């Protein structure tokens, strides 16, 4: 049996790739810290992303295998993943040149629960080194596919300036169902600012000084792959521009919405002006 697809696209992806490439398209200088194998697929990934970001910090290794993923996009834009085998592709602390943090404004973990061996003391070390150099720390969450448990990062939140989980991820970690209670949980654990991505309901922001919710932009979604990563990239872009938190969240919502109108995890966004023009034409 065979199923005919309307379109097939080969592209790079993954949380950190989507986030860094979108940041670069928005006009920021972005580097990727990751392992990448030396296979033909690894070479194609490198060729794809080096058009946009600094790849000098990538660690190419013969003994690792980055997983290939088939993403099936449904008519409503939702997606299903078929993940291939992988081996030894998780970044480790010894792979990182921490001196780069001395000239870095933001260090982002994309995403907790999917960092391999770094999910633990490794990412704690990264964030502590980053903060010691004066960088802002940002973290997204992912599904707990390795069953690390909801308490896995309770010692890390105090080293996170901006935590940006999805509603479902926040619900899993906190055991709460109301947005204020979710955010308060993370704030009490030490996170300084919390942004909860709520999909079709927009995003919720809370810190010690302000609380607000921004609605979602109504768009026809072709593919929601990477929309959360694009949201984070849009938010970080706003931070780097020195915008207010409300403007950062609004821009982030728009960035995710624009991404949803194209196929692929980082192919929809072309630049800051595109997002600003989208904001002019769309009110929420």
Predicted regions located by residue number:
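A glycine-rich helix N-cap at a beta->alpha junction
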Residues: 48-64
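Short beta-strands and strand-loop turn motifs
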Residues: 82, 104-112, 134-141, 164-167
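Conserved phosphate/ATP/ADP-binding segment of small-molecule kinases
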Residues: 124-127, 131-136, 143-213
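Conserved phosphate-binding/catalytic region of the ribokinase-like
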Residues: 129, 179-284
């Amino acid at each position: 049996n065979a199923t005919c697809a309307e379109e097939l696209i080969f592209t790079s992806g993954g949380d950190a790739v989507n986030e860094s490439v979108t940041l670069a398209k928005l006009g920021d200088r972005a580097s990727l810290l990751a392992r990448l194998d030396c296979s033909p697929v690894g070479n194609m990934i490198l060729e794809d992303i080096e058009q946009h970001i600094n790849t000098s910090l990538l660690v190419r290794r013969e003994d690792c295998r980055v997983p290939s993923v088939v993403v099936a996009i449904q008519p409503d834009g939702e997606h299903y993943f078929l993940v291939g085998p992988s081996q030894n592709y998780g970044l480790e602390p010894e792979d990182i040149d921490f001196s780069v943090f001395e000239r870095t404004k933001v260090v982002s973990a994309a995403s907790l629960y999917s960092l391999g061996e770094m999910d633990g003391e490794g990412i704690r070390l990264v964030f502590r080194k980053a903060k010691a150099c004066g960088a802002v720390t940002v973290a997204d969450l992912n599904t707990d596919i390795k069953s690390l448990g909801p308490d896995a990062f309770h010692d890390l939140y105090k080293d996170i300036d901006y935590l940006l989980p999805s509603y479902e991820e926040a619900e899993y970690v906190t055991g709460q169902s109301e947005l204020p209670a979710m955010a308060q949980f993370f704030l009490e654990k030490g996170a300084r600012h919390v942004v909860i991505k709520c999909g079709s309901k927009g995003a919720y922001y809370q810190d010690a000084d302000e609380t607000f919710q921004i609605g979602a932009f109504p768009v026809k979604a072709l593919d929601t792959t990477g929309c959360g990563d694009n949201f984070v990239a849009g938010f970080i872009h706003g931070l780097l521009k020195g915008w207010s938190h409300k403007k950062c969240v609004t821009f982030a919502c728009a960035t995710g919405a624009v991404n949803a109108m194209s196929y692929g995890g980082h192919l929809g966004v072309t630049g800051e002006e595109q997002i600003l023009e989208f904001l002019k034409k769309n009110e929420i």
